[in-house]
A protein has these predicted regions:
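Conserved beta-strand-loop-alpha-helix hinge in the C-terminal portion
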Residues: 208-235
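Q-loop/switch helix immediately C-terminal to the Walker
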Residues: 87, 92-107
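Conserved ABC transporter NBD signature motif
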Residues: 60-68, 77
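Conserved ABC ATPase "signature" region
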Residues: 109-124, 146
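Helix-to-loop junction immediately C-terminal to a conserved catalytic motif
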Residues: 52
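The feature captures the beta-strand-to-loop junction immediately N-terminal to the Walker
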Residues: 37-39
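Conserved ABC ATPase signature
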Residues: 128-132
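ABC ATPase nucleotide-binding domains
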Residues: 225-264
Length: 264
């Protein structure tokens, strides 16, 4: 696969104190759903903020689409990358339908209608944004991000706003967008169960990447994950322990299949 984001030796700190990142390296595959997780204060949201604009003062390089982000104009970069930070988002219009159209340089009715249908926005189009649930506000922000980028969508704290089943539905929707609009999704999560149906999982801690790969292969490294202070999903944790006793060959997520395997 093609690498679309390449982060090399990234160093960043707030007010030149307490480095958040120390020589962080990371690469993101194009047309993937990539999850980033880590303990509290590991820099998950900060990393997305650094990717969301090319104006931060930092050391190291961030290459997107084979070009250093500092070499993009603001207009170019805004079209390349769109980010959703739900806690810091400001809506400019009172109604949902008006907010959807406000920043589109050229109105794309097909894309807009696709997003309205697939993000279940039809029932709220004429509602006042202030009356929306947290989930509907986030869905509106996702739709705006997709409308205004041709490449990368960054989504912060996804599982603070949606339950596990809702996130699975969103992943299905993201895959439609990847196929239809050639997009790449980079998300931050707290609960590792929500990484299983992504393509790649990064775990960051103490300024760097400590694990990276396909989610189930990463989650197999239970000792490293536990030392980082993260909780491994129950079925995965159980599978890993059973593998250690040679009772299981692979991680099994389905309880019935696991029982059947053990009773054979």
């Amino acid at each position: 696969m093609e690498v679309i984001v390449n982060i090399n030796n990234l160093e960043y700190s707030y007010n030149d104190k307490n480095n958040i990142f120390n020589n962080l390296c990371m690469y993101i595959q194009k047309n993937s759903i990539t999850a980033i997780s880590g303990p509290n204060n590991s820099g998950k949201s900060t990393l997305l903020k650094l990717l969301s604009t090319n104006k931060y003062n930092k050391k190291g390089s961030i290459i997107i689409d084979a070009k250093d982000i500092v070499d993009y104009s603001k207009k170019e970069y805004d079209k390349l990358v769109q980010a959703v930070f739900p806690n810091n988002s400001i809506f400019k219009q009172p109604k949902v339908i008006d907010e959807l159209y406000i920043n589109q340089e050229e109105i794309d009715e097909e894309k807009t209608n696709f997003l309205i249908e697939n993000l279940n926005l039809t029932k709220i189009l004429n509602k006042d944004i202030n009356t929306l649930s947290r989930q509907d506000k986030y869905r509106l922000l996702i739709s705006k991000a997709i409308l205004n980028t041709n490449s990368i969508v960054l989504l912060d704290s996804l599982d603070e706003y949606f339950n596990n089943n809702e996130i699975k539905e969103l992943y299905t929707f993201f895959r439609k967008c990847i196929e239809k609009y050639d997009l790449t999704f980079i998300i931050t999560i707290n609960n590792l169960i929500n990484s299983i149906e992504t393509d790649y999982l990064f775990i960051i801690n103490q300024g760097g990447t400590i694990l990276y790969g396909e989610p189930l292969k990463v989650l197999d490294k239970d000792n490293i994950i536990n030392k980082a202070g993260l909780e491994i999903p129950f079925m995965i944790d159980l599978s890993v322990k059973l593998k250690d006793y040679n009772l299981l060959n692979n991680i099994e997520l389905n309880k019935e299949r696991l029982i059947n395997t053990l009773w054979k």
